[in-house]
Amino acid sequence: MKAERSDVDRAHAIYTKGNLALYDWWVLGLSNQWIWSCPTEKLLDLYRAHITANHLEVGAGTGYFPAKTMPSAQPRIALLDINRNCLEKAAKRLAAFRPEVHQENVLEPLIIRGERFDSIAVNYVLHCLPGRLDQKAAAVFDHLAPHLQDDGVIFGSTLLGLDIQRPL
């Protein structure tokens, strides 16, 4: 899937340094519980069940979830985001783990050197990308698959609009 550059830029423009300063409080503290009816603790459980010590975090956000759930004191953690503000915020939070930082567009083929990952999180990413859910999900997973170990796991969550039929 090839998204127009302006569409991609608009999709992540909200993640300014100022907005990221409030993100954990607003999204993880209030919105998850009261607007989306999915308490942050449920997402932490998802991470605890699937994150490994060889992990790629797609859509770095603030680094909250890997910071709270990393199963190793010396992991290999990589952050991938198109937004420099998110990468800086998450890398600062995860500095003790010395994260790899990749500023790339997940809707395009990715260049990530080194061994493949045992876990890849795509959390709160798909709804931020431009385009139809089926097309952007296919593109994202096609671009991540070459970077996942054969027995690895991709996990995450997204927000669905009212017009999306939910399988669960």
Each predicted region: which residue ranges?
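Conserved class I S-adenosyl-L-methionine
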Residues: 1-50, 153-168
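A short acidic, Gly/Pro-enriched loop at the edge of an enzyme's catalytic core
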Residues: 110-120
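Helix-to-beta-strand junctions that scaffold the AdoMet/dcAdoMet cofactor pocket
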Residues: 129-130, 148-150
